[in-house]
Amino acid sequence: MAGKIKKGALVRVVREKLENSLEATASDTRFPSYLFESKGEIVDMNDEYALLRFYTPTPNVWLRIDQLELVE
């Protein structure tokens, strides 16, 4: 599925993959609910990460592509 994820796609964050990640152990694990309950748009990408914009007044966030799933 990660091969289908591209710039401009709408995605959701997979809670289990984010909460059990190395990045989660290095930061506050009280993730805001909008990460899991709303769609995010990919605004930029590199090899392993995607920059997500959520339609809430929050900063964009970089997450690993394997922590995302496409919204259909």
From Swiss-Prot:
Signal peptide: none annotated. It is found in: Cellular thylakoid membrane. It is a peripheral membrane protein. It catalyses: a plastoquinone + NADH + (n+1) H(+)(in) = a plastoquinol + NAD(+) + n H(+)(out); a plastoquinone + NADPH + (n+1) H(+)(in) = a plastoquinol + NADP(+) + n H(+)(out). It comes from the Bacteria. Keywords: Membrane, NAD, NADP, Plastoquinone, Quinone, Thylakoid, Translocase, Transport. HAMAP family: NDH1_NDH1O (MF_01354). Belongs to the complex I NdhO subunit family. NDH-1 can be composed of about 15 different subunits; different subcomplexes with different compositions have been identified which probably have different functions. This is NAD(P)H-quinone oxidoreductase subunit O. The gene is ndhO.
